[in-house]
């Protein structure tokens, strides 16, 4: 105190200025560990023999956290819709003069309804609140049926998907049932959008993909089991769900490598047949604007009913889907 202010502590007054000093300090930052848990529900099968086999249905319960500072919701929404239609999948583009004129005009129109709302929370309504709720709805539905599927159903809400498939990796490394007793895994990740105005992805040759009223992307359904892929198609038409399946993101060598980027992969690498259901990307992907008011709930309901019928078919058929595709090395790397 004497060196900086020239007086002892007892003589200091508020606002006093002292001399400049140089300080060397070593600061060590440590993040405290937090436990993250998968949530697993089991519905026992009704057949004494087949009940020891399992159909796994999953989603992920995490998202990407918070922003360092609050941003204006309308500004983020309009900017991404015009400049970054694939959200975080796009490069950090800044836009051009024509786009900014369009942004300013749309913001001015929105401001007529009141001031903007600042937000710093990535809610993840579609990614993957939609899939998580779809799995919960299926669990409740099957639990209320008088006649349960012959095989048991495993409902799994994976933690840490956004950190690198942590929860699904842990689940398949330490499964609560014998790993080879899981006959298939159905993964729902982002099933709440898919409109004609959404850029849902890119084809392998760089063409934009767009959604529509009956839109649904499938990834991986025939990579390990042709039989599973055929079953998914048969249920879609036979049960009159009438989705138009888009397989463009499942192309071999696709640069987005989506087959390796969601929880189904951690099952597939152990040669468990999988299907990844998604309505695809959009301008709110990993953005503050991924909020519930933008979910297409009737479309999400249709996806949920489709997957429930597929799970029931897998649960009741005589044989498990045969693995006839190229088997994977669970310790190897993933390349679509």
Q: Which stretches of residues belong to each language-model region?
A:
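Phosphate-handling active-site elements
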Residues: 140-153, 178-180
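Soluble non-cytosolic domains of exported or imported proteins
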Residues: 31-32, 51, 116, 125-133, ...
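Second-shell loop/turn segments in exported
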Residues: 24-30, 71, 78, 82-83, ...
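Soluble metallo-hydrolase cores and metallopeptidase-like ectodomains found primarily
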Residues: 1-124, 137-140, 144-147
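Solvent-exposed loop/turn segments at secondary-structure junctions
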Residues: 30-33, 47-48, 61-65, 160-164, ...
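Beta-strand segments within the central parallel beta-sheet cores of soluble alpha/beta enzyme folds
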Residues: 54-56, 150-158, 184-187, 324-326
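Metal-dependent peptidase/peptidase-like ectodomains
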Residues: 1-3, 158-276
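His/Asp/Glu-rich mid-to-C-terminal helical/loop segments that flank catalytic regions of hydrolases
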Residues: 278-336
């Amino acid at each position: 105190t004497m060196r900086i202010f020239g007086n002892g502590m007892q003589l200091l007054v508020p606002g006093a200025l002292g001399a400049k000093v140089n300080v060397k300090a070593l600061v060590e930052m440590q993040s405290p560990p937090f436990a993250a848990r998968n949530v697993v529900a089991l519905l026992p099968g009704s057949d004494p023999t087949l009940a020891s086999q399992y159909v796994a249905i999953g989603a992920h319960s995490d998202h990407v956290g918070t922003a360092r500072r609050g941003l204006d919701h309308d500004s983020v929404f309009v900017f991404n819709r015009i400049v970054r239609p694939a959200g975080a999948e796009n490069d950090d583009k800044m836009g051009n003069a024509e786009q900014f004129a369009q942004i300013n005009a749309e913001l001015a129109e929105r401001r007529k309804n009141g001031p903007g709302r600042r937000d710093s929370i990535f809610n993840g309504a579609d990614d993957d609140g939609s899939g998580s709720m779809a799995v919960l709805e299926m669990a409740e539905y099957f639990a209320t049926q008088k006649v349960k599927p012959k095989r048991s159903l495993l409902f799994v809400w994976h933690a840490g998907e956004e950190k690198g498939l942590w929860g699904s990796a842990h689940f398949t490394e330490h499964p609560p049932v014998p790993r080879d007793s899981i006959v298939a895994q159905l993964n729902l990740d982002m099933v709440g959008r898919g409109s004609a105005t959404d850029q849902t992805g890119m084809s392998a040759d760089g063409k934009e993909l767009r959604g529509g009223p009956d839109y649904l992307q499938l990834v991986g359904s025939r990579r390990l089991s042709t039989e599973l892929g055929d079953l998914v198609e048969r249920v879609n038409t036979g049960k009159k769900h009438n989705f138009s399946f888009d397989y463009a993101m499942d192309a071999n060598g696709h640069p987005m490598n989506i087959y390796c980027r969601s929880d189904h992969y951690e099952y597939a690498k152990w040669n468990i047949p999988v299907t990844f259901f998604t309505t695809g990307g959009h301008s709110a992907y990993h953005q503050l604007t991924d909020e519930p008011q933008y979910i297409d709930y009737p479309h999400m309901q249709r996806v949920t009913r489709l997957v429930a019928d597929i799970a029931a078919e897998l649960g009741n058929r005589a044989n498990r889907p045969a693995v006839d595709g190229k088997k994977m090395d669970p310790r190897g790397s993933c390349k679509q």
